[in-house]
């Protein structure tokens, strides 16, 4: 078979169109995005909200976002690095922390809309599937889950954040088959396993296992827990207190920043015209004075 080199003509380059920048960077799935933001044409000026969850190495970001021509508008946001204010100082990126972040965002956005008393959600997290029921006065706040580019595997942390938002009182279309504890064989959600994940039971079980088998590994893997005095038996109670604290005061707390430190100046301060003028006069006077002293010495000799 003869090898034929493919030649791109002038017309090819003339008609070539590059893909969107965020597609070229591999950051946005536009096929999924267009299905999330497309609004019915008979709904005018009605935003379609997305419940956006993203994970970094040390943080969890949860946002309520709506799309506009000018760009995406963030209505409310919650971060895992806010959780130490509510009593959770360790394990800020696991399934239980994702649940807390989703719960915090749900309570925050409902308080912003003055719907927090009307839609309390599921106060006691049992691990069972929960969907908010509409009341007679106002419909529940509806958003669509935006997972980005992650693999939506069963038990993924993003579904922990989803469960937190659902228990917080948001209306998000979902299925229970991706929550931790869902069995593929009998197609049923084991609520006890899911509850275990929500309250950090998987973390405490691993701590106990390492404590029995590999104490040295426990010291390295859970050094932050040991330093803060968090024990395996107290983890569930800690998360219960965090959930209660979030419901009590979900609003963002501004941190008090210390005054900036005054740095030593190494460059000379720029003088004004008057200061330069006075400095010159003083120098001239000093030179004249020095010249007069020399004349007096010559006369004495």
From Swiss-Prot:
This is Large ribosomal subunit protein uL18y. It is found in: Cytoplasm; Nucleus; Nucleus, Nucleolus; Nucleus, Nucleoplasm. Disruption phenotype: Moderate reduction in cell number. Abnormal leaf patterning, with the abaxial mesophyll features appearing in the adaxial mesophyll domain. Double mutants oli2 oli7 have further reduced cell number but exhibit also excessive postmitotic cell enlargement in leaves (compensation phenotype). Plant missing both OLI7 and GIF1/AN3 have a strong compensation phenotype. Its main location: cytoplasm. InterPro entries: Rbsml_uL18_euk (IPR005485), Ribosomal_uL18_C_euk (IPR025607). Residues 247-267 are annotated as: Disordered. The gene is RPL5B. GO terms for molecular function: 5S rRNA binding; mRNA binding; structural constituent of ribosome. Gene3D superfamilies: 3.30.420.100. Belongs to the universal ribosomal protein uL18 family. Keywords: Cytoplasm, Nucleus, Ribonucleoprotein, Ribosomal protein, RNA-binding, rRNA-binding. PANTHER family: LARGE RIBOSOMAL SUBUNIT PROTEIN UL18Y-RELATED, RIBOSOMAL PROTEIN L5-RELATED. Residues 249-261 have a biased composition (Basic and acidic residues). The keyword tRNA processing does not apply. GO terms for biological process: adaxial/abaxial pattern specification; cell division; leaf morphogenesis; translation. It comes from the Eukaryota. HAMAP family: Ribosomal_uL18_A. Component of the large ribosomal subunit (LSU). Component of the ribosome, a large ribonucleoprotein complex responsible for the synthesis of proteins in the cell. The small ribosomal subunit (SSU) binds messenger RNAs (mRNAs) and translates the encoded message by selecting cognate aminoacyl-transfer RNA (tRNA) molecules. The large subunit (LSU) contains the ribosomal catalytic site termed the peptidyl transferase center (PTC), which catalyzes the formation of peptide bonds, thereby polymerizing the amino acids delivered by tRNAs into a polypeptide chain. GO terms for cellular component: cytosolic large ribosomal subunit; cytosolic ribosome; nucleolus; nucleoplasm; plant-type vacuole; plastid.
């Amino acid at each position: 078979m003869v090898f034929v080199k493919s030649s791109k003509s002038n017309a090819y380059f003339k008609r070539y169109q590059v893909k969107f920048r965020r597609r070229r960077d591999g950051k946005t799935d536009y096929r999924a995005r267009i299905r999330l933001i497309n609004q019915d044409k008979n709904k005018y000026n009605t935003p379609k909200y997305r419940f956006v969850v993203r994970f970094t190495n040390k943080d969890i970001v949860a946002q309520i976002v709506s799309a506009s021509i000018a760009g995406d508008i963030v209505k409310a946001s919650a971060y895992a690095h806010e959780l130490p204010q509510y009593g959770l100082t360790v394990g800020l990126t696991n399934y239980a922390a994702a649940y807390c972040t989703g719960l915090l965002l749900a309570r925050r956005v409902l308080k912003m809309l003055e719907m927090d008393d009307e839609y309390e959600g599921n106060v006691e997290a049992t691990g069972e599937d929960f969907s908010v029921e509409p009341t007679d006065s106002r419909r529940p706040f509806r958003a669509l889950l935006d997972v980005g580019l992650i693999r939506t595997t069963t038990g993924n942390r993003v579904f922990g954040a989803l469960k937190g938002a659902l228990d917080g009182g948001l209306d998000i279309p979902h299925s229970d088959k991706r929550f931790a504890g869902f069995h593929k064989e009998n197609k049923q959600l084991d609520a006890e396993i899911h509850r275990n994940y929500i309250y950090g039971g998987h973390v405490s079980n691993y701590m106990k296992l390492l404590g029995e088998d590999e104490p040295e590994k426990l010291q390295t893997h859970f050094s932050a827990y040991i330093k803060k005095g968090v024990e395996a038996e107290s983890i569930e109670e800690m998360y219960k207190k965090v959930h209660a604290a979030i419901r009590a005061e979900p609003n963002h707390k501004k941190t008090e920043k210390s005054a900036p430190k005054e740095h030593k100046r190494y460059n000379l301060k720029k003088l004004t015209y008057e200061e330069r003028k006075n400095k010159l006069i003083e120098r001239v006077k000093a030179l004249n004075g020095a010249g007069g002293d020399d004349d007096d010495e010559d006369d004495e000799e």
